[in-house]
Amino acid sequence: MKPPILIIIMATIMTGTMIVMLSSHWLLIWIGFEMNMLAIIPILMKKYNPRAMEASTKYFLTQATASMLLMMGVTINLLYSGQWVISKISNPIASIMMTTALTMKLGLSPFHFWVPEVTQGVTLMSGMILLTWQKIAPMSILYQISPSINTNLLMLMALTSVLVGGWGGLNQTQLRKIMAYSSIAHMGWMAAIITYNPTMMILNLTLYILMTLSTFMLFMLNSSTTTLSLSHMWNKFPLITSMILILMLSLGGLPPLSGFIPKWMIIQELTKNNMIIIPTLMAITALLNLYFYLRLTYSTALTMFPSTNNMKMKWQFEYTKKATLLPPLIITSTMLLPLTPMLSVLD
């Protein structure tokens, strides 16, 4: 793709998201979603092959269905309230339809099936945009309509998303699919807290984006797409590979890494709201995520996959691509736990 075209497409994606975030009128929000969706299709099809075409088609159909459902909910709400304003959701059916549409855009269970398939079919760069930037717009709308959301519906979706995110990643060898299932689980944690403490959801989303960005950038740095290629990279770039493994453990929520903060605070907040069973179940199912990350770490760092004799550990540094953003991203993705007492302002 030529640089001027890429710049225009990326600017359109950013503009679409900004329109969604800054609007309080449902029609403008819908336009922002459509701009965002149509602009990311060429990014997903950047590497032109049947897998990328299939992934783009699946993404387009899912997002178009979600947009249609959202507009239907907005129309029903308009008939009852007579207003396009986002804060006036007076009809419960309209609220359920809007919530369903936004969760479909985010990839929450039971609308999660497109996320692993689309992520696996595109390049690492496209997958990174899909699992980070594309989550911001729907989450910002959920944040704004959180007082009107049906809590029971969202809690059910959250619990099943955490379960699906852990269960689906267990037998995966493709790193992009592992990241996709991790994304589903993280979206579940955010959905669980959004009706009780929306500000905490923003903290969770920020940390999730930081950790996912860092992990994908390291994947791109050493061109790893499978667990086997990651284990071979252990011989070639031990430092980069060990950073990937630490980031994955952080994504799994292992203390004392940054990924533990949102899980800890969400469980604490739900318990304060007299909910015991749901946070307990979520904590238990989150162990599935942690298990497949630990298994990946063990198989990569502590066991040696079959390889040829010329793939022994290289101790000298090779020339690698410069990545100025990576060090601060890695530090914030792994070492923020000591700052947790400062987050008491969220209560």
From Swiss-Prot:
**Subcellular localization, as worded in the UniProt entry:** Mitochondrion inner membrane
GO molecular function annotation: NADH dehydrogenase (ubiquinone) activity
What assembly does the database describe for this protein? Core subunit of respiratory chain NADH dehydrogenase (Complex I) which is composed of 45 different subunits. Interacts with TMEM242.
GN (gene name):
MT-ND2
Which InterPro entries does the record associate with it?
A: Complex_I_Subunit_2, NADH_DH_su2_C, NADH_UbQ_OxRdtase_chain2, ND/Mrp_TM
Pfam families attached here? NADH_dehy_S2_C (PF06444), Proton_antipo_M (PF00361)
Q: Which domain of life is it from?
A: Eukaryota
Q: Which reaction does it catalyse?
A: a ubiquinone + NADH + 5 H(+)(in) = a ubiquinol + NAD(+) + 4 H(+)(out)
Q: What is its EC number?
A: 7.1.1.2
Alphabetized, the UniProt keywords read: Electron transport, Membrane, Mitochondrion, Mitochondrion inner membrane, NAD, Respiratory chain, Translocase, Transmembrane, Transmembrane helix, Transport, Ubiquinone
Annotated GO CC locations = mitochondrial inner membrane
Task: Name the PANTHER family for this protein.
Answer: NADH-UBIQUINONE OXIDOREDUCTASE CHAIN 2
- For the keyword Transmembrane, the answer is yes
Name the chain's protein.
NADH-ubiquinone oxidoreductase chain 2
| Protein family membership | Belongs to the complex I subunit 2 family.
Which leading EC class covers this enzyme?
translocase
What organism is recorded for this protein? Canis lupus
What main location does UniProt list?
A: mitochondrion
What is its membrane topology? Multi-pass membrane protein
KW Transport (keyword) present: yes
- Protein's GO biological process: mitochondrial electron transport, NADH to ubiquinone; mitochondrial respiratory chain complex I assembly
Q: Which residues cross the membrane?
A: 3-23, 25-45, 66-86, 93-115, 149-169, 178-198, 201-221, 237-257, 274-294, 325-345
Role noted for this protein: Core subunit of the mitochondrial membrane respiratory chain NADH dehydrogenase (Complex I) which catalyzes electron transfer from NADH through the respiratory chain, using ubiquinone as an electron acceptor. Essential for the catalytic activity and assembly of complex I.
